[in-house]
């Protein structure tokens, strides 16, 4: 923890870390709601071996690097609903403020200027505890923009595990999240 952080901030971070440790399988959105914090703060509280902050400034290259994974599960949530879609990244284009992903199985229009953080996450699944691998994008308020699960409820294919590790190393953020956000 940083010496120049106010005590209430350190207490909040400790509270979030304790909740993550106590409930490793709980959905991060639910933990964030329970704790009254943005979901990105829950992700940042994960143990270092389970989360890597990626360089959000390289968002387009990162999104394009998801195509070789083949079929993935994309989750998008807002205050009223969550949608889960199985599809493949590809068909990339830019129109106005949108970066588009348009394939036969996935149709996304991403307001890339709103992206604030992105992470490579390893987490026990909330349903069966099986380890999941995901790339999770957050907006500038700390809410999840969308999450891309490389496996969901089943084992990850060995080649996807290798690609995930390579992606995590290639896009790893060289500055802490809050600083990276301020530098953009």
Q: Can you say where each PLM-predicted feature lies in the sequence?
A:
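Eukaryotic intrinsically disordered, low-complexity regulatory linkers and tails enriched in Ser/Thr/Pro
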Residues: 1-184
């Amino acid at each position: 923890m940083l010496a120049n952080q106010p005590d209430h901030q350190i207490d909040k971070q400790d509270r979030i870390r304790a909740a993550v440790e106590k409930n490793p399988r709980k959905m991060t959105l639910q933990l964030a709601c329970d704790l009254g914090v943005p979901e990105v703060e829950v992700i940042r509280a994960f143990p270092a071996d389970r989360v890597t902050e990626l360089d959000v400034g390289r968002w387009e290259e990162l999104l394009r690097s998801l195509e070789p994974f083949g079929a993935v599960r994309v989750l998008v949530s807002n205050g009223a609903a969550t949608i889960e879609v199985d599809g493949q990244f590809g068909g990339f284009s830019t129109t106005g403020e949108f970066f588009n992903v348009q394939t036969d199985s996935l149709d996304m229009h991403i307001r890339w200027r709103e992206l604030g953080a992105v992470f490579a996450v390893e987490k026990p699944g909330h349903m069966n505890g099986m380890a999941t691998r995901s790339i999770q994008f957050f907006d500038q308020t700390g809410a999840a923009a969308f999450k891309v699960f490389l496996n969901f409820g089943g084992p990850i294919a060995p080649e996807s595990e290798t690609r995930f590790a390579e992606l995590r190393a290639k896009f790893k953020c060289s500055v802490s999240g809050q600083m990276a956000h301020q530098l953009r």
